């Protein structure tokens, strides 16, 4: 009994730490292609491509602006070029960088949705891009 109580007391803080790091605490919405397309049909939604300038030039979603999340100036650029009173819909190639960007922006007071699996899922669903 005493051993079980000690085990329980020691494991509780670890479980709290693990649960606090789960995706349930995301401050943004990760959406599929259809939801993303519906969101950006609203012209007040700002569309942000967080890939490199080279990737952006290869093809991007209409109305998107490009701010590379891997640069040291991403946060400053986003705060300068984006309006916090309007939702930001963002994407990258596969979803990894956009999740990082979504976290940064949401922590800075932006309302954010991100395209799950990135522009790859967009093009795989036969959606258009522009060069």
Identify the meaning behind each predicted range.
Residues 47-49:
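Structural scaffold elements adjacent to functional motifs in cytosolic proteins
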Residues 2-6, 19-39, 45, 54-87, ...:
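Rhodanese-like catalytic fold shared by cysteine-dependent sulfurtransferases
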Residues 9-18:
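Bacterial N-terminal signal peptides
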Residues 91:
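Short, surface-exposed ligand- or partner-binding patches at beta-edge/loop junctions that are enriched
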């Amino acid at each position: 009994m005493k051993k079980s109580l000690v085990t329980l007391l020691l494991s509780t803080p670890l479980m709290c730490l693990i649960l606090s790091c789960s995706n349930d605490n995301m401050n943004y919405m990760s959406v599929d292609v259809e939801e993303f397309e519906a969101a950006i049909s609203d012209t007040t939604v700002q569309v942000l491509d967080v890939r490199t300038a080279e990737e952006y030039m290869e093809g991007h979603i209409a109305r998107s602006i490009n701010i590379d999340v891997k640069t040291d100036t991403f946060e400053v650029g986003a705060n300068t070029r984006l309006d916090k009173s309007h939702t930001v819909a963002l994407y990258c190639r596969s979803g990894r960088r956009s999740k990082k960007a979504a976290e940064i922006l949401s922590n800075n007071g932006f309302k954010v949705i991100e395209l799950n699996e990135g522009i790859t899922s967009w093009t795989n669903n036969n959606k258009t891009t522009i060069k």
